[in-house]
């Protein structure tokens, strides 16, 4: 299967291990990824607030590249996924904005037609690779690993954007855990916000917010946490020492990127998946 691939900014900077592990796992799964080196940031959520026309153009440009090549666009970041889906909807509903965006894209020989398909890597795994094929490809079952899923909010809300995720109470990561042999831990914070965008102005609030989620996961038996978003990973992993100080209790929960978890089950090593780049180390009983 051939896919246009958009890693986003974090996976090429603070979370380079996410980009590297995605490429490794994609090759193992037989996915061909076409990456657009000139692709820019989608604008996070901040550019939309101050320069909405730029927000539309940034995202439509990347969508237009994938359209030009006739490929679905695969993402590995929740916020990037939401931005693309927002722009698809906004331009479908506003013909004048659509025309202005195409006027801007014309200078580069691009045109956005509105036919773009966006797929987060999680959806590719469960919908395109599929449960049966994944089970066949597993070389090292993650038996004995009790893992909590942390979805974050941008991959589940607003529900109207998501055909795959049709509510806040989805179970896709838990289904994937089961396929890979791990046991899923249920807890209250699994679909809540990670506080990444709050941390820029109110870091203390973000630390308290997410510390509560991680403590709840650990209290319910989690030995590690898997997340499909690098922004969530950044907060859950790098702020964990501050959370421990705030909670006055140790957490020590390794935070694993989605493709790293899949890669372990496919037989790749922790070193190959660059798990040593994480702030919180983890030795997995597999």
Region locations from a protein language model:
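Iron-sulfur cluster-binding electron-transfer modules in prokaryotic oxidoreductases
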Residues: 1-286
């Amino acid at each position: 299967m051939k896919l246009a691939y958009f890693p986003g900014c974090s996976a090429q900077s603070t979370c380079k291990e996410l980009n590297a592990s995605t490429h490794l796992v994609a090759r193992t799964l037989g996915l061909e990824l076409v990456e657009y080196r000139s692709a820019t940031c989608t604008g996070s959520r901040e550019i939309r607030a101050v320069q909405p026309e730029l927000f539309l153009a940034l995202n439509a440009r990347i969508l237009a590249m994938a359209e030009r090549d006739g490929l679905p666009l695969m993402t590995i970041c929740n916020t990037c996924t939401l931005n693309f889906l927002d722009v698809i909807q906004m331009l479908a509903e506003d013909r004048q904005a659509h025309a202005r965006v195409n006027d801007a894209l014309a200078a580069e020989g691009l045109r956005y037609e509105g036919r773009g398909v966006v797929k987060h890597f999680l959806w590719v795994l469960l919908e395109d690779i599929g449960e049966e094929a994944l089970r066949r490809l597993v070389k090292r079952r993650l038996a004995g690993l009790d893992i909590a899923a942390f979805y974050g909010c941008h991959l589940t809300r607003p529900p109207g954007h998501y055909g795959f995720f049709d509510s806040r109470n989805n179970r896709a990561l838990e289904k994937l855990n089961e396929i890979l042999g791990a046991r899923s831990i249920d807890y209250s914070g699994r679909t809540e916000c990670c506080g990444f965008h709050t941390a820029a102005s109110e870091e203390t609030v973000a630390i308290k917010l997410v510390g509560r989620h991680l403590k709840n996961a650990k209290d319910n038996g989690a030995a590690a946490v898997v997340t499909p978003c690098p922004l969530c990973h950044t907060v859950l992993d790098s702020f964990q020492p501050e959370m421990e100080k705030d909670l006055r209790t140790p957490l020590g929960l390794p935070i694993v990127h989605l493709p790293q978890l899949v890669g372990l089950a496919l037989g790749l090593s922790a070193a190959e998946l660059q798990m040593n780049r994480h702030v919180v180390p983890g030795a997995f009983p597999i």
